[in-house]
């Protein structure tokens, strides 16, 4: 059961990370200039 739970959490975190990364990358409010911190 621990293996299954670990696998599920890994998949969930993976998809959430992809979603957040894609959302931030496609956010029109961000300036295209990479020098902005």
Swiss-Prot record:
Keyword Transmembrane among record annotations: yes
Cellular component GO terms held in the UniProt record: photosystem II reaction center; plastid membrane; thylakoid membrane
TM region(s), chain numbering: 1-21
Taxonomy, superkingdom: Eukaryota
Cell location: Plastid membrane
Major place of residence: plastid
Membrane topology of this protein: Single-pass membrane protein
Record's keyword terms, sorted: Membrane, Photosynthesis, Photosystem II, Plastid, Reaction center, Transmembrane, Transmembrane helix
SUPFAM superfamilies documented for this protein: Photosystem II reaction center protein I, PsbI
GO biological process, one term: photosynthesis
Family the entry assigns: Belongs to the PsbI family.
Function: One of the components of the core complex of photosystem II (PSII), required for its stability and/or assembly. PSII is a light-driven water:plastoquinone oxidoreductase that uses light energy to abstract electrons from H(2)O, generating O(2) and a proton gradient subsequently used for ATP formation. It consists of a core antenna complex that captures photons, and an electron transfer chain that converts photonic excitation into a charge separation.
Subunit structure: PSII is composed of 1 copy each of membrane proteins PsbA, PsbB, PsbC, PsbD, PsbE, PsbF, PsbH, PsbI, PsbJ, PsbK, PsbL, PsbM, PsbT, PsbX, PsbY, PsbZ, Psb30/Ycf12, at least 3 peripheral proteins of the oxygen-evolving complex and a large number of cofactors. It forms dimeric complexes.
PANTHER family: PHOTOSYSTEM II REACTION CENTER PROTEIN I
Name of this protein: Photosystem II reaction center protein I
Lineage of the species this protein comes from: Eukaryota, Viridiplantae, Streptophyta, Embryophyta, Tracheophyta
